[in-house]
Amino acid sequence: MAKAKLVNSPSVVGGVDTHKDLHVAAVVDQNNRVLGSEFFATTRQGYRQMLAWMASFGTVERIGIECTGSYGAGLLRYLQSAEIEVLEVTAPDKMERRKRGKSDTIDAESAAHAAFSRIRTVTPKTRSGMIEALRVLKVCRKTAVAARRIALQMIQMNIVSAPDELRDQIRHLTRMQLIRTLAAWRPDVTAYRNVQDAYRIALKSLARRYLELHDEIADLDVMITSIVDELAPELIRRKAVGYECASQLLITAGDNPQRLTSESGFAALCGVSPVPVSSGKTNRHRLNRGGDRAANSALHIIAIGRLRTDTKTQEYVAKRVAEGHSKMEALRCLKRYISREVYTLLRNQNRQINSTQITT
């Protein structure tokens, strides 16, 4: 579908407040005046109707959308396929909200105003490539790991409170021996009113759940490893960079890392860029507590790994400490350097992938 454009028509900018079942759209003209607002269903037909409605006011130059990673993901993909420029609207205008209050229509108009002025907006992730697939698999793995941990905790708690004769049979086993032994039990399921049989039934159920989740995690690890190897082979070869950290950094950068215009922007996204807090004669910086904390954690793990095994990293931290910095301050500087290294690798790899696709 080509970009919505009418001959000799005025330019308009759209804004969308996204929800689960209905999106609220608004349109502003070349002077940032509201032309109208409307509700649309969160279906492909609804997306088509929304774009046609916006185009009825003029040429749609761009559209600002809230929550492109959740409720607005489907609309984002549709508009990108229609070659419409999309901006993600971040935080609402607090001053405007205090004056006008809050409603879905007001939020849609605010998104349109933000897109018109290009304030409180960022370039959204495309969410249509392999990194989006990686993100979905990683989220699935994370929940499976959490569920497996809970299953193991419940097994251990039940064993602690189980009858002595039952507990004595399994207390000497290692973790996997215990899990496989419990999963192989054949309790009498008709005797569930008996305490000991009820414990056997519960422990067998928990053990089988643990093993199923264990196999599920192993399958997901194979898929995640394959994607990371394909997307970031150079990154995974760097010291102390494992698949868990590499996958998280890829997800943070997104399928279109070119939206990050500088390595300092990537550092800010990862929360490793120092924030200036200077005033008058005071000139200092503080720790950045914003950004993607999962990416920050990945950089921290890489830094700790290099600090333990890499001689150059150890020398760098020792030099910083000798200059009067604390070890934690030296570690923050190290994370900043690692983010620069990661940014360069991801940008170069993205250029290589794009070049290969164009050649093909």
What is each PLM-predicted segment?
Residues 80, 86-124, 132, 136, ...:
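Short alpha-helix plus adjacent loop in nuclease-associated cores
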Residues 22-45:
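Short glycine-rich, Thr/Ser-proximal phosphate-binding strand/loop in the N-terminal lobe
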Residues 139-234:
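Glycine-rich, often acidic, oxyanion-interacting loops/wings at catalytic, nucleic-acid
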Residues 236-237, 243-327, 355, 360:
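Phosphate-backbone recognition surface of nucleic-acid-processing proteins
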Residues 5-29, 111, 144, 248:
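Gly/Thr-rich phosphate-binding beta-strand-loop-beta motif of the actin/hexokinase/Hsp70
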Residues 45-62:
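Short, basic/hydrophobic alpha-helical segments
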Residues 322-360:
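Basic, amphipathic alpha-helical segments enriched in Lys/Arg and hydrophobic/aromatic residues
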Residues 59-71:
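Short glycine-rich phosphate-binding loop at a beta-alpha junction
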